[in-house]
């Protein structure tokens, strides 16, 4: 009995610590990009995956202590995929007491009709889904649309565009929608996917898999995701450093003439951002920028539990 109590305390301690980190990450992103303002009505797009469940949970948590007032309405798009468990999300949201709307649109049928067997469905599916969500936001009077993309998604998009699109373009934490009528926010922009996964596992969210894209092998995004996970294991801190680089762009030291007036550089021009250091010896720090070793949570847990036992 005592052992079971210790396990429960350990799990609760880890969950509390993890939730605080996620809450801090979301709070910082909201503040840095002014994502949520007084009186906002946030349409939280809920797919049934770990990311959107976590986003809703953290936003609900922040709502209780935020210095501003804002409301949440969860929206799920039922795309009429075969075997989609229609009861799961309504039951979950009613239990939470969260306002919600289920939008039923047979985008699955459209995708299957338009896309040849074996081809990637993501692009068409995303466009259809986007249009429906924009329309729903208008109907609900939502001032912001919240999507569940996290830090890893943002980095993956950056590399996808570099490797396959030939451009430095990521996934912005806040943007104007394609139709120019809605503001889209990504509150999980600073959150690590592995933290979200651990949180979702601990909370035992009723996950609904995507039968359209989740079962498609060899997607380019999956290749990039595997590469980043490998780097994260072999080179601790590299992911943090790359994300930090996205927040510290130096246009004068790239090659885009739209971002910097290279033609305007003449004799007598000011030195910009340190000038050219190409011939200087590079001073590389021993540890990547913005990296901190992860806490040994097992040791912390054991220490805390031992203190509890002594008392």
UniProtKB/Swiss-Prot annotation:
<dbReference type="InterPro" id="IPR012089">
    <property type="entry name" value="tRNA_Cyd_32_2_STrfase"/>
</dbReference>
<dbReference type="GO" id="GO:0005524">
    <property type="term" value="F:ATP binding"/>
</dbReference>
<dbReference type="InterPro" id="IPR035107">
    <property type="entry name" value="tRNA_thiolation_TtcA_Ctu1"/>
</dbReference>
<keyword id="KW-0067">ATP-binding</keyword>
<dbReference type="GO" id="GO:0051539">
    <property type="term" value="F:4 iron, 4 sulfur cluster binding"/>
</dbReference>
<keyword id="KW-0819">tRNA processing</keyword>
<comment type="pathway">
    <text>tRNA modification.</text>
</comment>
<feature type="short sequence motif" description="PP-loop motif">
    <location>
        <begin position="47"/>
        <end position="52"/>
    </location>
</feature>
<dbReference type="InterPro" id="IPR014729">
    <property type="entry name" value="Rossmann-like_a/b/a_fold"/>
</dbReference>
<keyword id="KW-0411">Iron-sulfur</keyword>
<comment type="function">
    <text>Catalyzes the ATP-dependent 2-thiolation of cytidine in position 32 of tRNA, to form 2-thiocytidine (s(2)C32). The sulfur atoms are provided by the cysteine/cysteine desulfurase (IscS) system.</text>
</comment>
<dbReference type="InterPro" id="IPR011063">
    <property type="entry name" value="TilS/TtcA_N"/>
</dbReference>
<feature type="binding site">
    <location>
        <position position="122"/>
    </location>
    <ligand>
        <name>[4Fe-4S] cluster</name>
    </ligand>
</feature>
<keyword id="KW-0808">Transferase</keyword>
<dbReference type="GO" id="GO:0034227">
    <property type="term" value="P:tRNA thio-modification"/>
</dbReference>
<dbReference type="Pfam" id="PF01171">
    <property type="entry name" value="ATP_bind_3"/>
</dbReference>
<dbReference type="GO" id="GO:0016783">
    <property type="term" value="F:sulfurtransferase activity"/>
</dbReference>
<feature type="binding site">
    <location>
        <position position="125"/>
    </location>
    <ligand>
        <name>[4Fe-4S] cluster</name>
    </ligand>
</feature>
<keyword id="KW-0547">Nucleotide-binding</keyword>
<protein>
    <recommendedName>
        <fullName>tRNA-cytidine(32) 2-sulfurtransferase</fullName>
        <ecNumber>2.8.1.-</ecNumber>
    </recommendedName>
</protein>
<dbReference type="GO" id="GO:0005829">
    <property type="term" value="C:cytosol"/>
</dbReference>
<keyword id="KW-0963">Cytoplasm</keyword>
<keyword id="KW-0479">Metal-binding</keyword>
<keyword id="KW-0820">tRNA-binding</keyword>
<keyword id="KW-0408">Iron</keyword>
<keyword id="KW-0460">Magnesium</keyword>
<comment type="subunit">
    <text>Homodimer.</text>
</comment>
<dbReference type="GO" id="GO:0042803">
    <property type="term" value="F:protein homodimerization activity"/>
</dbReference>
<dbReference type="GO" id="GO:0006400">
    <property type="term" value="P:tRNA modification"/>
</dbReference>
<keyword id="KW-0004">4Fe-4S</keyword>
<dbReference type="GO" id="GO:0000049">
    <property type="term" value="F:tRNA binding"/>
</dbReference>
<dbReference type="GO" id="GO:0000287">
    <property type="term" value="F:magnesium ion binding"/>
</dbReference>
<keyword id="KW-0694">RNA-binding</keyword>
<comment type="similarity">
    <text>Belongs to the TtcA family.</text>
</comment>
<feature type="binding site">
    <location>
        <position position="213"/>
    </location>
    <ligand>
        <name>[4Fe-4S] cluster</name>
    </ligand>
</feature>
């Amino acid at each position: 009995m005592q052992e079971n109590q210790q396990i429960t305390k350990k799990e609760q301690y880890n969950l509390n610590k993890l939730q605080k980190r996620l809450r801090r990450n979301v709070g910082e992103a909201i503040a840095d990009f002014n994502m949520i303002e007084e009186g906002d009505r946030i349409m939280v797009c809920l797919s049934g995956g770990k990311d959107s469940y976590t986003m809703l949970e953290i936003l609900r948590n922040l709502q209780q202590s935020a210095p501003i007032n804002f409301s949440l309405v969860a929206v799920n798009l039922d795309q009429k995929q075969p075997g989609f468990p229609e009861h799961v999300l309504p039951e979950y949201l009613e239990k939470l007491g969260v306002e919600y709307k289920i939008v039923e649109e047979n985008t699955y049928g459209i995708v299957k009709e338009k896309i040849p067997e074996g081809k990637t469905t993501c692009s068409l599916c995303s466009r259809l889904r986007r249009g429906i969500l924009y329309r729903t936001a208008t109907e609900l009077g939502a001032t912001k649309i919240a999507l569940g993309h996290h830090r890893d998604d943002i980095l993956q998009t950056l590399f996808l565009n570099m490797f396959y699109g030939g451009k430095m373009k990521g996934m912005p934490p806040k943007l104007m929608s394609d139709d120019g009528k809605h503001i889209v926010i990504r509150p999980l922009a600073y959150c690590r996917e592995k933290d979200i996964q651990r949180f979702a596992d601990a909370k035992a969210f009723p996950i609904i898999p995507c039968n359209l894209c989740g079962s498609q092998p060899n997607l380019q995004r999956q290749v990039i995701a595997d590469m980043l996970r490998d780097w994260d294991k072999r080179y601790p801190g590299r992911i943090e450093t790359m994300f930090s680089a996205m927040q510290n762009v130096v246009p004068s030291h790239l090659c885009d003439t739209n971002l910097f007036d290279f033609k305007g550089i003449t004799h007598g021009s000011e030195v910009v951002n340190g000038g050219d250091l190409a011939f200087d010896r590079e001073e590389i720090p021993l540890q990547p920028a913005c990296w901190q070793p992860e806490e040994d949570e097992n040791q912390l847990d054991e220490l805390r539990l031992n203190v509890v036992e002594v008392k």
